[in-house]
């Protein structure tokens, strides 16, 4: 794996895959390590990663660095400033694929900001989803990102779990073994899950292709019928 800042000095040995990683998680470094580790095992390919951050988060990182106490840990803010590009510069046509992480904003509404509520970077995020859709760039939307995308494209709402947060590792069954993403998966796989919300199952199944599910998780992996998005409500990237 090569980051764009050192790719020019590197000597790739295989076919190059260019990926964009939009990271909206608070645990910036841990999230990126979890996502990059499996990418390093792709035999015969070198992966060039470009990190992106919504401009509002980049601006906030710069402010937090400036205002930090002398002994404060500002490594994750410095990392964003040094290695991440602003989301407003993202052109999906320059990449072979994209990954959209979750975000620690589960309690915020999925729709546009109103009366000061909602995610500060919502408009920029939605514009990014539209650009990806228009360019048909293969994209994995994880957890919160999947909920936002499903709501934006198909008006699929989400519901808070009455039983409380669903946490654990669940075996999800392969519902579409003939699908190109699932033909080597076998009967199913274990999926780490940590979430308070579930997408409306009836509307979800009416608009996308369910790929994997279980009774506990509902649809855990789905794909556009005619589009570039893969929606994953769990976290395959989590460490064992």
Where on the chain are the PLM-derived regions?
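Amide-donor transfer/coupling interface in amidating biosynthetic enzymes
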Residues: 1-58, 63, 88-90, 94, ...
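Intrinsically disordered, low-complexity coil segments
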Residues: 40, 58-75, 111-120, 134, ...
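Glycine-rich, highly charged phosphate/nucleotide-binding loops
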Residues: 68-93
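Short, flexible loop segments at the rims of nucleotide/cofactor-binding pockets, characterized by
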Residues: 74-78, 115-119, 169-170, 188, ...
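Secondary-structure junction/capping motif
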Residues: 83-86, 119, 223
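Short, Asp-centered acidic motifs that coordinate Mg2+ and/or phosphate
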Residues: 97
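Cysteine-nucleophile active-site neighborhood
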Residues: 100-176
């Amino acid at each position: 794996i090569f980051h764009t800042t050192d790719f020019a000095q590197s000597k790739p040995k295989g076919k190059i895959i260019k990926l964009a990683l939009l990271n909206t998680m608070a645990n910036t470094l841990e999230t990126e390590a979890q996502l990059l580790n499996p990418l390093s095992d792709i035999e015969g390919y070198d992966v060039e990663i470009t990190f992106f951050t919504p401009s509002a988060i980049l601006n906030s990182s710069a402010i937090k660095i400036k205002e930090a106490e002398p002994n404060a840990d500002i490594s994750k803010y410095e990392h964003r400033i040094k290695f991440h590009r602003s989301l407003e510069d993202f052109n999906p046509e320059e990449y072979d694929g994209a990954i959209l992480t979750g975000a620690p904003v589960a309690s915020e509404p999925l729709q546009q900001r109103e009366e000061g509520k909602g995610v500060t970077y919502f408009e920029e995020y939605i514009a990014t989803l539209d650009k990806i859709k228009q360019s048909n760039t293969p994209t994995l939307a994880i957890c919160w990102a999947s909920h936002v995308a499903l709501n934006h494209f198909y008006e699929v709402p989400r519901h808070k779990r009455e039983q409380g947060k669903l946490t654990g590792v669940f075996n999800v069954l392969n519902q579409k073994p003939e699908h190109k993403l699932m033909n080597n998966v076998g009967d199913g796989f274990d999926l780490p899950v940590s979430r308070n919300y579930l997408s409306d199952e009836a509307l979800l199944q009416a608009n996308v292709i369910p790929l994997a599910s279980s009774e506990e998780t509902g649809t855990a992996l789905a794909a556009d019928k005619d589009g570039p998005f893969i929606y994953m409500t769990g976290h395959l990237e989590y460490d064992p």
